[in-house]
């Protein structure tokens, strides 16, 4: 979904939850939640070290204190490009899969400084699946899939009818979808 508005709120201008909103929902709610975002490593403030840990180097300037980390809600990049997959969760651990193959399990307790679980993944088309778990018990899941060639516009309205009084409003969300209805 395209970014609409500033990057310092929990919601954008039209009410869509931002990455920051998903992150804080994981911290503040008891309902199990897992959310995936991605960013090419070369554009990220996080870099993977030789030992597999991550170093954070914030952008300079005062505005960085207000903005959230650059991320995207998509899984479509150049083949073999190094992508940082970030997972927000309130589960004790997350297992990440790419096209059904496990990329490993990470514990939230190992990422306490930023509370963001991270993997460096060479991009391949398909589906990322993050499974939030407590031992063998699955608590929550999230997926990102590679979108195909755009083939249709999908409309979603928050209301079906309006009164002709000059005060009613209907929000219409337009998305571009492929044959599998992936945005």
Where are these regions (language model features)?
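Substrate-binding clefts and catalytic carboxylate motifs of secreted carbohydrate-active enzymes
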Residues: 1-166, 179-183
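Short, solvent-exposed loop/turn segments enriched in Ser/Thr/Gly
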Residues: 166-172
């Amino acid at each position: 979904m395209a970014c609409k508005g500033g990057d310092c709120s929990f919601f954008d201008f039209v009410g869509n939850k931002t990455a920051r909103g998903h992150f804080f929902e994981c911290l503040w709610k008891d309902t199990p939640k897992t959310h995936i975002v991605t960013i090419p490593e070369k554009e990220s403030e996080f870099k993977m070290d030789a030992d597999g840990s991550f170093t954070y180097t914030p952008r300079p300037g005062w505005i960085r204190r207000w903005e959230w980390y650059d991320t995207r809600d998509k899984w479509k990049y150049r083949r073999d490009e190094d992508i940082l997959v970030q997972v927000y969760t309130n589960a004790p651990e997350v297992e990440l899969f790419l096209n059904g193959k496990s990329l490993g399990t990470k514990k939230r307790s190992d990422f306490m400084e930023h509370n963001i679980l991270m993997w460096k993944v060479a991009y391949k088309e398909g589906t990322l699946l993050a499974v939030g778990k407590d031992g063998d018990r699955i608590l929550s899941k999230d997926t990102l899939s590679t979108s195909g060639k755009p083939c249709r516009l999908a409309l979603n309205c928050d209301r079906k009818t309006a009164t002709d009084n000059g005060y009613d409003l209907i929000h219409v969300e337009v998305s571009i979808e492929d044959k599998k209805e992936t945005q």
